[in-house]
Swiss-Prot record:
Binds 1 Fe(2+) ion. One of its GO terms (biological process) is co-translational protein modification. Belongs to the polypeptide deformylase family. This is Peptide deformylase.
C-alpha cells in the first residue's frame, strides 16, 4: 500500500505519526505539480490535511490524538511529494474574549500554489517560526516577504489569486517552501540570527 493510499483510507485520521521529521529526504525534494482533473485520492488528501489542522487547533481532539497545533501543512510533510498545501489561520478573540465574527482569516487547500508577486519589504515573526516536522526550537528571524500574491488551483480545478500580508503571508510562504525542499531555518542568518534589516517588518 502506497503512502497516499494509506493516508486517504476512509477511517484514517492524519496524526503526528504520519508527519515526517527533518532529515527525511522527502523534505528536501522539489514536489511535483498535480495534474487536473485531480484524482479522488488527491482531493481526499487535501481534505484530510485540513481535517488534521482543525483537529490540531481543537483542544479536546489535540489532547486525545496527541497533536501539536498547526496552521499549515504541506503534502511533503506527510511523505507525499506533491504540490498541495492546507492552511487554517484562526482569527483571535476580541479583548473581552468573545469569538470572532469569522472563525478564520485564511482557510484553504491550495493545489500547485505559486508566488507570482511579492513586496520588496521583508518581514519576520518576532518569536521565530516552528514546524510540525521540526521537534527542536530554532531561534532567529525567518526573513520572508511582507506581502505576496499567490496563484493556486482549488480541488475543482478553478484558478484563484489571493493577496496576503502579515501572518497569513508568512504561513503560506512557509508551506510553499516545503514544496521546494526548503526548511524555515534555511532562511535564518546563521551569523546574525536576530539582525533586523532596514525596513524589515517584525510581526508580533
Amino acid at each position: 500500500m502506497s503512502v497516499i493510499e494509506r493516508l486517504t483510507k476512509a477511517a484514517h485520521l492524519i496524526d503526528m505519526d504520519d508527519i515526517i521529521r527533518e532529515g527525511h529526504p522527502t523534505l528536501r525534494q522539489v514536489a511535483e505539480e498535480v495534474a487536473f482533473p485531480l484524482s479522488d485520492q488527491e482531493i481526499i488528501l487535501g481534505e484530510k490535511m485540513m481535517q488534521f489542522l482543525k483537529h490540531s487547533q481543537d483542544p479536546v481532539m489535540a489532547e486525545k490524538m496527541k497533536l501539536r497545533g498547526g496552521v499549515g501543512l504541506a503534502a511533503p510533510q506527510i511523505d507525499v511529494s506533491k504540490r498541495i498545501i492546507a492552511v487554517l489561520v484562526p482569527n483571535p478573540e476580541d479583548e473581552e474574549g468573545n469569538p470572532p465574527a469569522q472563525a478564520y482569516s485564511l482557510q484553504e487547500v491550495l493545489y500547485n500554489p505559486k508566488i507570482v508577486a511579492h513586496s520588496v519589504q521583508e518581514a519576520a515573526m518576532e518569536g521565530g517560526e516552528g514546524c510540525l516536522s521540526v521537534d527542536r526550537e530554532v531561534q532567529g528571524y525567518v526573513v520572508r516577504h511582507a506581502r505576496v500574491t499567490v496563484d493556486y488551483m482549488d480541488k475543482n480545478g478553478e484558478k484563484h489569486r489571493i493577496k496576503l500580508k502579515g501572518f497569513n503571508a508568512i504561513v503560506v510562504q512557509h508551506e510553499i517552501d516545503h514544496l521546494n525542499g526548503v526548511m524555515f531555518y534555511d532562511r535564518i542568518d546563521p551569523e546574525h540570527p536576530f539582525a533586523v534589516k532596514e525596513g524589515m517588518l517584525v510581526i508580533e
